[in-house]
Amino acid sequence: MKKFLSSPVVWLLLIVLMIFWPFVFFGKVPLPVDTLVGAYLPWLDYKWGYIVGVPVKNALTSDAFSTFYVWKGLVIDLLRHGIFPLWNRYSFSGTPLLATFHTAVLFPANLLLLLPSGFGWGIFILLATIAAAFSMFLFLGTLVKEKASRVIGSLIYALAGPMTTWSQFGTAVWAASLLPLILYCLDGTIKGRRLIYFPLLTFLIGLLIFAGHVQLLTYTAVIAPLYFFYRQKKTLGKINPGLSLKVILAAGIGLGLGAVQLLPSLDFFARSIRSQENYASFFNFGLSHWTQAIRLWAADFFGNPVTINHFSSFSYHEYSSYLGVFVLPLIVSFLPNSFFSYLFFASLFLAFDNPISRFIFSLPLPLLTYSSASRIFFLTNLAAAVLAALSIDNLFAGKTSRRRLLFSGLFFAAVTLVAIFFVDGEHRAISLRNSSYYLSLLSAFLLSSVFIKNRFILSLLLVLLFSFDLGRYYAKYNPFVSRTFIFPDTPVTTFLKEQKPPFRIAREDTNLLPANSWTAYRLESVEGYDPLFSSDYAHYFHRLSGNPYENGVSRYALLEGINHKFLSAANVQYILTKNTTEASAKSYLAADLVKEGYLPVFTDKSVTVYADPAVKSRAYFVTKVRFAKDKAQMGRVLDDPQFDPTAEAVIMGEPFESNFGQNEVLAINHRDNEVEISVRSQDGGFLILSDAYDPGWRVYVDGTKTTLYQVNGAHRGVIIPAKTGQVTFRYEPASFKLGLVITLASLALTPLYLLGLHLLKRR
């Protein structure tokens, strides 16, 4: 037992468990659904056991529940029913689910969500942080000797900077946990002790692809080869062509394992809004201003959103870079000539605004520059964790000068004090108060490091100081809440769930049902939020609000006005509005809805639900089809006030005979990857299904595959011959089929690859 309790692995585990104490001891869930019930209607109308409503800790992390949690829940629900999660029919009138990439559909840890609601998510988030800590602990075993150094480096990697602020989103920390393991395997291949490192590298690369964080995947694809060749030169004195070829083959098979995810995502990326929206450029590509550098060691210098005193124009969440108050003094006092020193300064150089970084991130580089440059702080975190561990290791060995450590610490303390005087008077008190914490902790660290000679006492104090600092940073930012807050029912959601499907909903305001949250109730909407959704649908969506088709696109599809005919054609039967007399929160759509013939059918406190009595069925026939030669002409047709999408259609392509008679839709059986429609077609007609078009959909008329048309820019259409009885739409994307074949082939190739390595070693 004594040996067990003295194990650094046990201490590392206990530290992480203590940081997650609200979940471990009280079952509170690491998911910010306090924001759901405390800031959004219809939940806001209820107190949920509180006197004045649920207090909201951190609204900046709302994407964790409104996107990532509901996506994971949908994936598990589909798998539970034996349906492969290819398609999400609940947002954007339908959108790819697997191909969206950050849904991480195939990540094995998703299976934890089969556990009871809330508990499974808590385990999922907790294990991600544990995995990050343990992977760094394993990797540091090849670089440092002291157990305390390994524990501290592991804590820095698992808890510093974006590892804390992105913790509850469920993808980034899992992806980051794999990077040290990949580097560890590369080291193992160079040392040549065991062949297992090659297939393990293959497996980890595939797992990284499935983890669902494209930036970390891209960064790994850059730094892993650089690290591999650097370590070869350092260890072997040269680049070994045979070894390099073996590793390249292992990595190639790993990419093949992930092909079932990569190919659909790359295919979808080419048709998405990602390269067209100006989100990243609007925020200067996510580059940090040099004044934000102080947040590397004083996270709350500009305040904190949790305490509602953050006053910087740079988002606390997006630009999170905190390494811990002790890390930079350690790095400066002992800066080795190593790969991680170069990585540390290169990542900082690219993360902060300068002509070179601005030029690089302004380039159209898919998977890299279409997202925020601040994501590179994950690499800063990695390098800092290794460098800090090396510095502490050398501190114990007497190679890190304690005097230099003292002066470097005093330097950062002086910079902090000077910076306070440059803060405007209104906010200076915040910076002064918050900095006092960091300066006090830094003083304790410097005094301990300089004057305590006993190795055991110093090790214990340093571990405690780092644990307290980084644990406080994590606990302050991330909410742990009651499971009862996870998408509870309200009269409004209950009313909508009781209506006969299929139908879609929309809202007049983002304070009504946060984007995508309706997925948790299995309600379908024309709206949605996603950095990766169809560009064609984004343009079409403008017409629902009465805006021009060619307007710019963004990751938000939010109703801004009423275009009744287009909403009806999209099967929008219910629209939620605010029901209040307060001028600042008064409904701006209610009067227009009444004018267009919508009827108020349900009211609960601050929310009124309007219904369209003339809404079109999910599938309907039109008697007139127009033809456009390109998207520009199609856009002009859709913008034409005389165009009526409930009675006619416009498609791109060669004209065909469109003299259609009367037809009837008898029944619709709407499933996730398949839609079956029974029709009565006397003379032949043109059938529209108002689900979003995607090239992966196929259509079968009485069992025979036929042409699927993209209708009105975003919906699906098909010519129905006379005497037809059954129409079936199936989602069968070719990219998924090809990817699956490559993945299975790579899986089969892995043991053959290992066998080949074994035979080569015996020769």
Region spans (language model):
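Transmembrane-helix signature of polytopic, membrane-embedded enzymes
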Residues: F137-L159, R193-I196, Y342
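Membrane-interface coil-to-helix junctions
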Residues: M18-M136, L155-S177, A270-Q276, S281-V325, ...
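Extracytoplasmic
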Residues: F283, I430-R433, L464, F468-G661, ...
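Contiguous transmembrane helix-bundle modules in multi-pass membrane proteins
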Residues: V9-W11, T171, A175-S177, C185, ...
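Active-site-proximal, structured, solvent-exposed surfaces of multi-pass membrane proteins
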Residues: N516, P641-R763
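Perimembrane helix-loop-helix junctions
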Residues: M1-K2, Y219-G254, S265
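Short aromatic/hydrophobic helix-turn
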Residues: I152-T164, L200-L207, L257
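Selective detector of the "anchor" transmembrane alpha-helix that sits immediately C-terminal
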Residues: P116-G141, L323-Y342, L441-L446, K737-L760
